[in-house]
């Protein structure tokens, strides 16, 4: 579970390149994009699992997580025939309009103690066809405090995430290409080992948010990629009033996410405001302790959106160079 997307890694969020001289966020950030990764690739940070209310389960070694779907199922079968207008993502709790950009600001412990942490999400007008379905491309940039320069931010991850909405209003997660950087070594490129695309190596797409939010009493599948031991599940907890820096909202939808294949435990809570999207990320028992709130939200102008498009297409092209799974997809356009 990466972060967050308008939904939302997530968190774990999930999770993507702004350092090519183009930055939207008004803070001190830096990073570099080398042309090739080092030999050794590193795994992304821990995903989340098991709520405090759930019964205890056996601890297993980290290198042998339980590959189980006992805690979530595909309650909505995937069928490409049900996507007549997949790029129109107008779900009340997760609208994705090209040019929408928002920032979640907070803190997380990524192994260096609790540090400041910002994630910038941009809904692009780039299209990526996956399994024959035209998908909306979300550009996700994760900035963390630079250990060598406290008070400044450095790019830790840059990601392309793909979404589509079916005719019943379910928002589907259709894959991710996350590039990772070592912030303890000046932002050195580490590759993109946690890439997943539905239909390749047994990977399954899942739903970010179901269309009928009243039908969410049990856990439902968000994504499953056995080759990288990635399994995310979510359930709907209810609605509430919630306040963040950009405002206070009624009828905020609360979801609970977990990663049953990860023995380390923890849940991630996400909060979606009607007509706005993911305004808050919180945790229950998650060792990473990620807490984020929406600190800004705006609509990009035509020039800004064009600059985003260029960066996203460049990142898409890099995917064919650095990841064998991604190399099996069609180029974005």
Question: Positions of the model-derived regions?
Answer:
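Conserved functional acidic sites
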Residues: 55-333
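Bacterial signal peptide processing site
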Residues: 28-30
């Amino acid at each position: 579970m990466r972060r967050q997307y308008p939904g939302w890694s997530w968190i774990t969020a999930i999770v993507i390149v702004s350092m090519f001289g183009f930055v939207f966020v008004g803070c001190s950030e830096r990073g570099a994009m080398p042309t090739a990764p080092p030999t050794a690739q590193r795994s992304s940070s821990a995903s989340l699992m098991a709520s405090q209310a759930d019964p205890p389960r056996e601890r297993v070694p980290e290198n042998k997580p339980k590959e189980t779907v006992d805690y979530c199922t595909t309650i909505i079968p995937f069928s490409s025939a049900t996507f007549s207008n997949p790029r129109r993502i107008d779900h009340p709790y997760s609208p994705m309009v090209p040019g929408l950009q928002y920032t979640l600001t907070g803190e997380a412990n990524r192994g260096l103690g609790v540090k400041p942490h910002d994630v910038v999400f941009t809904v692009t007008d780039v299209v990526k066809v996956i399994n024959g379905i035209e998908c909306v491309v979300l550009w996700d940039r994760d900035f963390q405090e630079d250990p060598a320069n406290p008070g400044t931010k450095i790019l830790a991850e840059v990601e392309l995430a793909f979404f589509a909405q079916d005719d019943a209003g379910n928002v589907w997660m259709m894959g991710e290409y996350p590039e990772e950087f070592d912030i303890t070594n000046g932002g050195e490129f580490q590759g993109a080992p946690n890439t997943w695309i539905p239909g390749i190596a047994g990977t399954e797409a899942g739903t970010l948010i179901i269309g009928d939010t009243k039908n969410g009493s049990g856990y439902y599948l968000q994504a499953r990629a056995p080759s990288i031991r990635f399994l995310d599940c979510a359930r709907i907890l209810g609605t509430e009033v919630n306040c963040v820096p950009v405002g206070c909202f009624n009828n905020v939808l609360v979801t609970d996410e977990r990663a049953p294949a990860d023995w380390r435990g923890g849940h991630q809570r996400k909060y979606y405001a009607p007509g706005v999207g993911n305004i808050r990320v919180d945790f229950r028992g998650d060792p990473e302790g990620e807490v984020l709130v929406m600190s800004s939200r705006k609509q990009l102008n035509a020039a800004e959106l064009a600059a985003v498009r260029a960066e996203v297409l460049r990142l898409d092209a890099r995917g064919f160079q650095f990841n064998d799974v991604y190399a099996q997809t069609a180029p974005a356009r």
